[in-house]
A protein has these predicted regions:
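Short, conserved beta-strand element in jelly-roll/cupin
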Residues: 26, 39-56, 66-69, 93, ...
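A short, acidic/glycine-rich surface segment
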Residues: 30-35, 109-113
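Residues lining hydrophobic/aromatic ligand-binding pockets adjacent to catalytic sites
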Residues: 34, 63-64
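Short, basic/aromatic beta-hairpin or loop at an interaction surface
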Residues: 59, 66-81, 121
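Short, solvent-exposed aromatic-acidic interface loops
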Residues: 64-71, 188-192
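Charge-biased low-complexity segments
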Residues: 79-207
Length: 207
């Protein structure tokens, strides 16, 4: 049932058809995960916590992610102030029933767990990736009709993007009225990234 609800959530909110076979991980004394990026598993990664965080007997176990400012570190750099760890790394505690979804290209890891050798008291999580992004249709519109229009957008996209060095995925939800016009367009999820100097152009393109 959990798998079914997770898949349904990914379809509704991310535009991804499925999830990869999920993994169950248990972190005890000395376990950690160094900073890394997951490529090319899927456009979104997830971590669902089964950890009784409020009653934990260990230290550590937070999910760590580099902040965007670090990934484009020298843009707007100021040498007049010091920088603390919290400004470089985002920490997310694995609280019970928390679902964390993030762009797996961002370097991420897990802070080392110390304080328990008992697997019943460790950092317990289910994790994996949302995969297979593709169109979904609700209503009488046929898949064949929609796909023919989507294929026609391919050439137009090249003109819209131009030389913008964009990478990532964007998912949209929209309705089609009786005249065949798209309306009520909404961005569901967006992992597109560009160098900081080009972000205004990226925002204009996506929005």
């Amino acid at each position: 049932r959990f798998h079914e609800r997770l898949v349904a959530w990914g379809r509704e909110n991310l535009g991804c058809h499925d999830v990869s076979p999920p993994w169950l991980s248990n972190y005890v004394e000395g376990c950690r995960q160094e900073l890394h990026g997951d490529l090319p598993h899927g456009p979104w990664a997830f971590v669902f916590s089964l950890t009784n965080w409020k009653r934990r007997t260990f230290r550590g176990g937070e999910t760590l992610m580099l902040r965007d400012e670090v990934l484009d570190y020298w843009h707007g750099f100021e040498s007049t102030r010091s920088i603390e760890q919290g400004e470089l790394i985002r920490e997310i505690p694995p609280e019970l029933n928390r679902l964390v979804v993030f762009d797996p290209r961002i370097p991420h890891g897990v802070r080392q767990v110390t304080g328990t050798h008992d697997p019943r008291e460790g950092r317990l999580v289910i994790h994996g990736w949302f995969v297979q992004p593709r169109p979904f249709i609700q209503g009488p519109l046929s898949t064949k009709t929609l796909m023919s229009r989507i294929e026609g957008l391919t050439d137009q996209l090249g003109g819209w993007i131009g030389e913008l060095p964009i990478a990532g995925m964007v998912s949209l939800r929209f309705a089609v009225d009786r005249q065949g016009q798209a309306c009520h367009v909404k961005v569901l999820s967006d992992t597109t990234r560009v160098p900081a100097r080009d972000d205004k152009e990226r925002t204009k393109l996506i929005r």
